[in-house]
Amino acid sequence: MRIQKRRTHVENILRILLPPIMILSLILPTPPIHAEESAAPQVHLSILATTDIHANMMDYDYYSDKETADFGLARTAQLIQKHREQNPNTLLVDNGDLIQGNPLGEYAVKYQKDDIISGTKTHPIISVMNALKYDAGTLGNHEFNYGLDFLDGTIKGADFPIVNANVKTTSGENRYTPYVINEKTLIDENGNEQKVKVGYIGFVPPQIMTWDKKNLEGQVQVQDIVESANETIPKMKAEGADVIIALAHTGIEKQAQSSGAENAVFDLATKTKGIDAIISGHQHGLFPSAEYAGVAQFNVEKGTINGIPVVMPSSWGKYLGVIDLKLEKADGSWKVADSKGSIESIAGNVTSRNETVTNTIQQTHQNTLEYVRKPVGKTEADINSFFAQVKDDPSIQIVTDAQKWYAEKEMKDTEYKNLPILSAGAPFKAGGRNGANYYTNIPAGDLAIKNVGDLYLYDNTVQIVKLTGSEVKDWLEMSAGQFNQIDPAKGGDQALLNENFRSYNFDVIDGVTYQVDVTKPAKYNENGKVINADSSRIINLSYEGKPISPSQEFLVVTNNYRASGGGGFPHLTSDKIVHGSAVENRQVLMDYIIEQKTVNPKADNNWSIAPVSGTNLTFESSLLAKPFADKADDVAYVGKSANEGYGVYKLQFDDDSNPDPPKDGLWDLTVMHTNDTHAHLDDAARRMTKINEVRSETNHNILLDAGDVFSGDLYFTKWNGLADLKMMNMMGYDAMTFGNHEFDKGPTVLSDFLSGNSATVDPANRYHFEAPEFPIVSANVDVSNEPKLKSFVKKPQTFTAGEKKEAGIHPYILLDVDGEKVAVFGLTTEDTATTSSPGKSIVFNDAFETAQNTVKAIQEEEKVNKIIALTHIGHNRDLELAKKVKGIDLIIGGHTHTLVDKMEVVNNEEPTIVAQAKEYGQFLGRVDVAFDEKGVVQTDKSNLSVLPIDEHTEENPEAKQELDQFKNELEDVKNEKVGYTDVALDGQREHVRTKETNLGNFIADGMLAKAKEAAGARIAITNGGGIRAGIDKGDITLGEVLNVMPFGNTLYVADLTGKQIKEALEQGLSNVENGGGAFPQVAGIEYTFTLNNKPGHRVLEVKIESPNGDKVAINTDDTYRVATNNFVGAGGDGYSVFTEASHGEDLGYVDYEIFTEQLKKLGNKVSPKVEGRIKEVFLPTKQKDGSWTLDEDKFAIYAKNANTPFVYYGIHEGSQEKPINLKVKKDQVKLLKERESDPSLTMFNYWYSMKMPMANLKTADTAIGIKSTGELDVSLSDVYDFTVKQKGKEIKSFKEPVQLSLRMFDIEEAHNPAIYHVDRKKKAFTKTGHGSVDDDMVTGYTNHFSEYTILNSGSNNKPPAFPSDQPTGGDDGNHGGGSDKPGGKQPTDGNGGNDTPPGTQPTNGSGGNGSGGSGTDGPAGGLLPDTATSMYSILLAGFLISALGTAMYLHQRRKQNRANQA
């Protein structure tokens, strides 16, 4: 009974409490749950590092006086900017060797030294570092080259700390700031600010005391790097450093080093505690890299040594080092939870300069250019260092000559005046770790300061040492360590050079003669350690023809680095120095050249490699060395190396450089050839120089051209080929064949060319144009029925090679070459009939069949057995021709612009050599053919080469004089008006490389039109970087067109699958953030992309125009013909997919001519527009509360640059289950409102699109909502509810119409569809205004937000009846009186497209934000309580509980009373 009463009592209590508890659950605020709040905060910190910049601020090679893409901080800074955009938590540091190393650094010392020391001027390089906002830096060994005063002044100008812990005063105190600890505010993964103390410490090799003895001795001392670290790092920890970064200007060895080591990174990582990251340098090497794979304690994948992340990012800004640290806070302090070191190359990743760098350094750069271009003298011979490591060399000879000249003057009145003077020099620029272009290559002629700096790279000073004969020999033994040991018994090819030996340590000593026996082991290794004490590689060491005595004394003039023992050379100690000078070696060289005025730096051959029989001593040098090897007796070119830009060469000795004389009956013929010059005459005078050189070297030679002299440059535009003809006559061509472009302007212009008729282009004949002084050979082109050309048709004829000939068109000719007959016949590609404009009367017969018949006639009728086919059918067809037609000895080809730089032979019973020399007169092809007495080619006695024609080739004076007349007149041609534009044509660099522009569209349209007409193309893709300027509204001149398209690129077509086209677009979009030039401007397709995704995953959709004009998704399996330019077609700008095309062809039409032709087609008046071909979209970030936000930094860039801002969602977003709530911050709204064009924001996915004009919104935090509320029985789409809120208030009506686009479920059910407003309360539909239908997408405009869907309007233009079973309520139909009609211009369609491809969905972000409708974001990672609201809720809850409690109490009392009464 008691239990029952107790249970009843409990039930009564629960009945009383339940209602208030339920009410409380509705009233009391429920805090959001964030799992991450309980976890330790994490920070992702990126350390960006540069090292060994060596004054290379600009991407400019001052020694060759031209821009380069290979190095320069101006390019590295683009990578820095990219990483800063990707991660706000970045530090930027420099690891030393910053201010010395090129003429810009030298200029600052020579002309700004006093101002820098006094502090009245900041070192220009430091100004750049300040502008880039470096966080810290350290000193490299070369910072000490200019003395301590200059270094102090340099440091003084830095806005960032420069630290060094191991350079001390003579009393043992730190000479520089040993370390700093800076507190950084970083953002953790939850978006919260965190304070992290970052410490920086720096080190430099102790060897600076030797290398810069004259600047440092008696002033400083240098502590061992590891000792210094262990002394200093505990202090940093004690002062609270959370993270310690070692800026270590020291290299990486693979094992522990002894105290005082030059390269101590391994020891820092293994012998110290507390370092979290190490920046390495000094060696100019790469880490992480494969070189260190498998070495104990090295992890190449993670870029760590002993678990500590390390980077060594090469030199000169070629790479950026990146160390990523994952920091976790535990027990109040930060620890490194994970780390990774990596390096990122500018090659392939950067295609433009950083404006911050260029703007800051520009004036110094210009001053440096003026400085290096100042002439100081002349050289009678070329000076290069291509073979400086294997033979005596002019680039070293001129330096040693100058040093000896200086020493003789300095020592003539000293006690040493009677001692013999020797001079030591080394090749500073010899490829190696610095690449295939890192060689001295100075042509004969003027010598400027830049050339002196190229010959002597460093700021060394002259010093003279006194040594004995045995010490001189050891010096040379040390140098001889450069060579590998060769085993004659092994035979074959053996590499001569030791890759571990630095070229600047290979000293040649002039004044003595000697040989190097490389069959013996080296006495010293690359560090100067004795490894074979009894070995002696130096043989026949003599002075003035007599063997050197070990005790004989010599003076050797060298530099301060070597005289102080630099490089580990034996015997070179300070007591051996008898003359120390402050004069730089470079200054001595300059003074020598100035005094001599003209120098002849020919090597005196005082040293050589001793001959080795039975083996080939091979080595690598630049491919640019090949022409010099071809002329040399002691070096031969073997072939291309696997290393880019390098060739393989071999030494030739007396016993193998002169092969056996040819067998009786062999006859040699040298055939020089060009093809596809396309009116590129700028280097024609240089071409003539090369031709004359070959003629002077050979006895039997002819000169041929394989066609396409026409079309491609202004010279043709102005003179229709007659300027080319003038130059060809001067050069003495023996024959040419027709290319397809010879027919571009029809028979009339070709007839003028064949007759020299200048009536059209030069009526007064000021240029004295004449007919060709050579015949045209054309066996398969029949012009006999063409009235303009038939008079030129001739029968086969014999001409004397090298003499003037009568013009005419012959099927073949015979050339009499010193009594030997050589037949030449011509072939032209058969598709010329459709790809050019020959007219209907000219017939192009089958090339192979014609060749068969022609060869037969030559052999049987002419009895000639030496036959050359001069063809314009393409390289692959040339190879096929050789296989199909017997009897051809040599094919000189054209059409495909192929560079054949090594012998290609097809054996068809007898061999046929196939050649082609690329394009535009860039090369002179040369084939040296050896025939036996039967006319059969002896390929083993024949040779093929291509001779480059570039700035290193002198211009023939006579040809130059003729050419200059044409060049001068072309300046007037450039002012010729070619059209008019009603709008400015946007070629702004920042636009054409990031988005669709009207100029990009116009160019792509012209390319597509021409390629469609000539080759059936359907698509055009061109690189935005090829558009170099815009054109203002008004008249368009030819000069402006050439400024837009200055490269003279030609039209190229390639057959690509849909998959490859998408890949091409991905390649074009891979480097947009850095201003890469590959950005694809297009015609014939539309594409959508986002930069939120990584390269390779940026293209979301590609559509192509179908034959009926619709835009349909591109089929990945179908093949399409794509038009582009020849640069992109060859894989340029990273478009490698074009090189994989199933078919590729250069149509030869030059870009600016296509541009002007497009103008003519449009009536010379144009107004191109941005049409929406290219759509860049922004992917929002989904927060944990389900809302979406826009990344502030990335969206700020996007909102400014995009043509139309789009926010793109996945296919399922906006559904009933996944409503969209996009929160746009106040600053983001402001950015959108400030846009000059189309200030709007469009949200879209596959099913819908909404475009909101910013005029409808105030500058405030905004929340935009889209949600599917299901579908109606009568609707053709879901019903969507659109909302927008600002400051917590819903905005119902708008000033400007909002565009809505919805996609239908089934287009088959559509009958006059339109978008309708759904008013559930009134059970009514209202049609939106200005509707349109595009396939299955329906668009309408409204001035208020509510629910909308697609309905059929029917034939009476009325909607169906409102379904009776649909719920009512919700929308009351009152939207502030807003109508559904847009006022003003109708916005463009903003519909989306296909669903987001895999891997491109917006990613979930970290950090939460507020719920509710205001759209304002709370603090990332959690919500602070709303105190006022909470207190109010608590008071209200208390009141309700009291009231309810009282009511329940009274109710229970009444019941009890009734029970008692009962």
Swiss-Prot record:
Pfam families registered for this protein in UniProt: 5_nucleotid_C (PF02872), Metallophos (PF00149)
Biased composition (Gly residues): 1405-1421
EC number: 3.1.3.6, 3.1.4.16, 3.1.3.5
Keywords per UniProt: Cell wall, Hydrolase, Metal-binding, Multifunctional enzyme, Nucleotide-binding, Peptidoglycan-anchor, Secreted, Signal
Biological process according to GO: nucleotide catabolic process
Amino-acid positions noted as binding a divalent metal cation 1 in the UniProt annotation, renumbered to this chain: D52, H54, D97, H284
Secretion signal, residue range per the UniProt entry: 1-35
Residues reported in the UniProt entry to bind a divalent metal cation 4: D708, N740, H872, H895
GO MF, any single term: 2',3'-cyclic-nucleotide 2'-phosphodiesterase activity
Presence of the UniProt keyword Hydrolase in the record: yes
Region named 5'-nucleotidase: 624-1427
Pentaglycyl murein peptidoglycan amidated threonine found at: T1427
TM regions (residue ranges): none
Subcellular location: Secreted, Cell wall
Propeptide: 1428-1462
Family to which the UniProt record says this protein belongs: Belongs to the 5'-nucleotidase family.
Role: Catalyzes the release of inorganic phosphate from 2',3'-cyclic nucleotides through consecutive 2',3'-phosphodiesterase and 3'- (or 2') nucleotidase activities. Also possesses a 5'-nucleotidase activity. Does not catalyze the release of inorganic phosphate from 3',5'-cyclic nucleotides. Probably plays a role in the cellular reprocessing of nucleotides present in the medium, under conditions of phosphate shortage.
Domain notes for this protein: The N-terminal region (amino acids 35-623) is able to catalyze the release of phosphate from 2',3'-cyclic nucleotides, but not from 5'-nucleotides.
Entries under PANTHER family matching the protein: 2',3'-CYCLIC-NUCLEOTIDE 2'-PHOSPHODIESTERASE_3'-NUCLEOTIDASE, 5'-NUCLEOTIDASE-RELATED
Protein name in the entry: Trifunctional nucleotide phosphoesterase protein YfkN
